Amino acid sequence: MKMADAKQKRNEQLKRWIGSETDLEPPVVKRKKTKVKFDDGAVFLAACSSGDTEEVLRLLERGADINYANVDGLTALHQACIDDNVDMVKFLVENGANINQPDNEGWIPLHAAASCGYLDIAEYLISQGAHVGAVNSEGDTPLDIAEEEAMEELLQNEVNRQGVDIEAARKEEERIMLRDARQWLNSGHINDVRHAKSGGTALHVAAAKGYTEVLKLLIQARYDVNIKDYDGWTPLHAAAHWGKEEACRILVENLCDMEAVNKVGQTAFDVADEDILGYLEELQKKQNLLHSEKREKKSPLIESTANLDNNQTQKTFKNKETLIMEQEKNASSIESLEHEKADEEEEGKKDESSCSSEEEEDDDSESEAETDKAKTLANANTTSTQSASMTAPSVAGGQGTPTSPLKKFPTSTTKVSPKEEERKDESPASWRLGLRKTGSYGALAEITASKEAQKEKDSAGVIRSASSPRLSSSLDNKEKEKDGKGTRLAYVAPTIPRRLASTSDIDEKENRDSSASSIRSGSSYARRKWEEDVKKNSLNEGPTSLNTSYQRSGSFGRRQDDLVSSNVPSTASTVTSSAGLQKTLPASANTTTKSTTGSTSAGVQSSTSNRLWAEDSTEKEKDSVPTAVTVPVAPSVVNAAATTTAMTTATSGTVSSTSEVRERRRSYLTPVRDEESESQRKARSRQARQSRRSTQGVTLTDLQEAEKTIGRSRSTRTREQENEEKEKEEKEKQDKEKQEEKKESETKDDDYRQRYSRTVEEPYHRYRPTSTSTSTSSTSSLSTSTSSLSSSSQLNRPNSLIGITSAYSRSGTKESEREGGKKEEEKEEDKSQPKSIRERRRPREKRRSTGVSFWTQDSDENEQEHQSDSEEGTNKKETQSDSLSRYDTGSLSVSSGDRYDSAQGRSGSQSYLEDRKPYCSRLEKEDSTDFKKLYEQILAENEKLKAQLHDTNMELTDLKLQLEKTTQRQERFADRSLLEMEKRVSGKSQYLLGGKKSSRKKDI
């Protein structure tokens, strides 16, 4: 029945199964399409890191790029070098991997092998042609990064063998950039190519690395100072982030936008290095002064036309600047400028001696200027007609900063000449690799607060015109104050020293021959030089020599009393609106420069003086300290007769109210997202890459903690060594004192035997050697116990535990000594009662004389023993074990003597008592003096021992705490390394799974 029921149930189950969803499924398992698709490059990198050469070959056959780089710029060869996979390194190099491929920070595979200390990989890479002089973004070669001595020796030998100049290799990038910048300046157009990933330009690289000469040339070539990369960073962002003060100053003097924000809403202040924040704020105040004066004055434009003949006799000084000077005389609020004027006069007196030599060269350079005149005039006419079709650039003070949104240079970024491409490939640390930015300073949450604080600071100051660069002159005092306080130090990359005067002269010749006459913009030094020239010429040549058109520095208006204000009206050049206004005014307001014919003599003198000022400034730079203000080089357009100096200097005026400034400066940006910014993500990836480079995943904090623990262990070792030396000295002292005591005890025993042989009977003779033997045995046992305790601390232990064991041994010996002291005190207390009996008995002896007189010999012996007691009292600095051994001998002999006396007293032999009394009385005196001094010694030594015990207990607790901390650290490090290993293993397994799935899919 049961079987039938079971079969029936089974049949019912089969009927239900037929037609069910499971039955309808096909026997072959359907493969679902994988939703996750990995990049081919990521699959290739995962295969290389796993060491699967067959898979790597298959991927290469399918067209995978062997030089594919991840987000950090690391290639498979980099990763193989970091992982110490020699086979994969050889496999990749044999299959055509670029052995000198740099990552985002300029590290080539040899850098990675050198930092990790893999000698075999480094030797193989060098044998295959790796460049030992390659420099990363921070200016480090593989030799600089190497830490192990063997690696340093290998790389140094290779550098010597190849004859590589390390310093030249470090400056190679700047040299290449200088060459390119000169070519662009001479050709008149810029062939810069943005970095493929970051979008960085040559101006970004020069600003971030502090290449000031390159920066000046690029700005002189009309490079846009506000150009942005793909993250929205301007060159000022880069210079501020990497702490390059000189680059920041040059950019601000050329009127870059200091309020420009990147893609995540950060200004240059938000990403700046902490050390230069104050300097940036000072620069912003000075730039705001320029902008505010420009806005408030809005001085009228002057147009005047005249022919060449009239210009030769008329004065050319009556132009826009003299009108502004006349307005400045009536202005009421120029007190702040008067302070700066006084400072400038003091500096001018200091520089008179250096100015005199350049003034003498003025006449010599005039003939040279006449030869260049024809070329410059022809070029100037073409440039002025070209600029008329665009928004008018500001040509003031030799500053060629494009101020309109349009770029002032043709950007031919699509095609590059083959020579340029070859040079790019050859350069080992090419600046076109770009810079990596980190968001380590200036989080998104701080942006709004920093902007509000900046608005409040800037609203209080007077704002100055954009086209009059007053920064360089007004920064002189600040630069000198900085020299007194100590120069600021940049922390990112080494600052390249300035060019010498010879190279600057070559640059000037190249610039004059190829393009419109390039004149260094007037710094405060150039302004003082011009004023000295004016004074000298006014004394020698008369008023007509004052009419030469000249470069004017930003501090114009401070010395208006020195200048002639009643000049005859003459021809002048039309002046464009300022750079600050070009952003706010409509395009129609931007007038073009209408060039007029000027005096040939004026043109000659202006070019001569301008060139002289440039040479003076370069010589000044060469002799000055590194923080001295350098002069940015920029071209000015020379007319058919006169230099068009589009100077719109404005001085005082009513300062706009803070509310107007805030309205004008209010930010209308969209609110920033709370998500992680690109710069923060890059910062985290950089940190992860640093931990990947070292195979153990050790971070900087771990290294610092390790150094601290090493320092502590060294200090404990030195302590332990000192303790061991002290113990050795104590042992030597103990041995010497024991030998002396043995000798003294033997001599005393001999004396006693000789002196008392007549009176003391045979029982006492039998007893005496036993007492001495017990005393000596007790001393030997005590000394052996102490020596064994001290020697136990000298066992072979690890260094970290020596201090603890020695402390334990010291405390053990001290405890044993304390126990011995307690026993002796108990013995003393036991003896106090018989002592009092003897004292009562003593006057009876004197009262009842038995006819036996005291020996004179006894008194002599007492004196000797007093001397010995005093000697013992002076030796209080002896160790505890020695004092205890001496104390034991005395106490044992005394106690045995007491027992013997009591036994003889009971026997009642009067004759023996009478014979024994002299010795007893002498022994009692000896006992009383010995015990007092010994008791005092023991008390003092007990106090010392208590203090030492307290110290050792404190040391012991400290050592226990340190031991617990070290064990916790080791456990924490072990856990951390395990977690990192698990993460890596899981990540690699995911990559492998994804790669295998994709390969299976392709196979299917």
Curated annotation (Swiss-Prot):
Residues 464-475, 514-525, 564-578, 587-602, 625-659, 770-793 have a biased composition (Low complexity). GO terms for biological process: neuron projection morphogenesis; regulation of cell adhesion; signal transduction. Detected in brain, lung, aorta, heart, gizzard, stomach, oviduct, spleen, kidney and small intestine. Keywords: ANK repeat, Cytoplasm, Cytoskeleton, Phosphoprotein, Repeat. It is found in: Cytoplasm; Cytoplasm, Cytoskeleton, Stress fiber. PP1 comprises a catalytic subunit, PPP1CA, PPP1CB or PPP1CC, and one or several targeting or regulatory subunits. PPP1R12A mediates binding to myosin. This is Protein phosphatase 1 regulatory subunit 12A. The lineage of its organism: Eukaryota, Metazoa, Chordata, Craniata, Vertebrata.
